[in-house]
Every structure is written in C-alpha cells, then in structure tokens.
C-alpha cells in the first residue's frame, strides 16, 4: 500500500514538473548550499551543533506575481548523538549518521510583488509548503524492520533579494514533518531489553534544511522603468 502511495506521489511530481517546464517564460533554476538538522528521540530541540552539510538544485515556475511552484532535489548528511535529558538517555548513549536524499514539490507565496518593474522593492519574505519523498542510507544495525524511503511534508519560509533582472539570492529555513520514527534508528521497543536502544514511539522524527541559494531567471524585468540596472 505504501509503495503504491510513493509511486503515485512520484508520478504527480514528475507530471507537474514537466507541465511547468513548458512555461519557459516564467522559469527559473537555482542551486544552494546549507545544512540538514534533526530532532527526535536523541535530540529534543533544534541544535546547531548537529548541523551537517547539504546541497540543493531546483526549478521554479512563477504562476502569478506572488505565487510560484518549485521542484527540488536536496541531498546531504544528517546525524546526531545523544543529548541526555535523563538517566535513561545517558545509558542509551546512541548516535546515527546517514546520507539523505530528498525530492520535493512546493508552492511558494510571496508577500510582495517584487518582480514588478514599477516598484523599487528588491526583496520579499515568503512562505512555502508541499510534499516530499526522502530516502536515507547508513551503516546502522536496524533495531526494527522499516523502509528507508518515506514521505514528508516540507514547510517553512525565507527571504529573497534581487541582484539584477537575471539573478537573485535567497535565504530559507524549512522543516520536514515526517510520519516516521526510525530516522535515528530509535523508536518503541521491549522495555525488558537491557540494551536501552528504544525511545518514544508516539513522537516522530523530523529534519530541517537551512540554506542559502542563488537563482537564474529566464525572463527579464521590463527595462524602461527597471530600477535594478
């Protein structure tokens, strides 16, 4: 059942992407560098200490003056070690490190019509949300049988800044809400087992991307009143 769901989502992503590529007059491509981070059984709150390198490439189509569609591939390292909150966590003393690969499609909403040549606005804050598939690999002895390909809901926000009619910069932070509790290889288990390799199976693991990107547009802001030249 879950395999069928993943196939349908992948088909949807590909269909939408090909449809949007046809609208070349509103197209953009970009790449970015940043970090993956994680919260779960080992680390309860976001901790910059566990940020690990990641990179992304993406395609964007502007559907209106404030709404855009984006398809992206993001990959990098993700991992953490135990941040003890009690005696049990100290005994468990677990850690993990994976290579994570993500494909996502999201819709973006910009609060300002920053591409309007009649306005002297070089920046806009924005929000985004969508759907993603991610997979991971690592040298982990699994505590349970599970699939390493899962679905996530990416959402977050950022700021974009225009450099000139063809290039702009972005700073973005996004959370990936998962429906999976084994990203850190720790979840529920037999509490009679004295190896302590179990956690809270009622709280799923989540991961995050914080990054900086540069974008190249394939359209030009009209020149007569262009404030960026």
Positions of predicted regions on the chain:
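Gram-negative (and chloroplast) outer-membrane scaffold detector with strong preference
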Residues: 65-139
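Predominantly the C-terminal beta-signal and adjacent terminal strand-loop region
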Residues: 82-83, 164-229
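Residues that define the transmembrane beta-barrel architecture of outer-membrane proteins
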Residues: 25, 49-53, 99-103, 123, ...
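Residues on the lipid-exposed face of transmembrane beta-strands in outer-membrane beta-barrel proteins
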Residues: 31, 57-61, 105-109, 129-133, ...
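Extracellular loop and loop/strand-boundary signature of outer-membrane beta-barrel proteins
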Residues: 39-45, 88-96, 140-145, 197-200
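Short glycine/proline- and aromatic-enriched beta-strand/turn motifs that initiate or cap beta-hairpins
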Residues: 23-62, 211-224
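Transmembrane beta-strands of outer-membrane beta-barrel pores
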Residues: 33-39, 75-79, 111, 131-137, ...
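Repeated loop/turn-to-beta-strand initiation elements of outer-membrane beta-barrel proteins
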Residues: 27, 65-69, 115, 166-169, ...
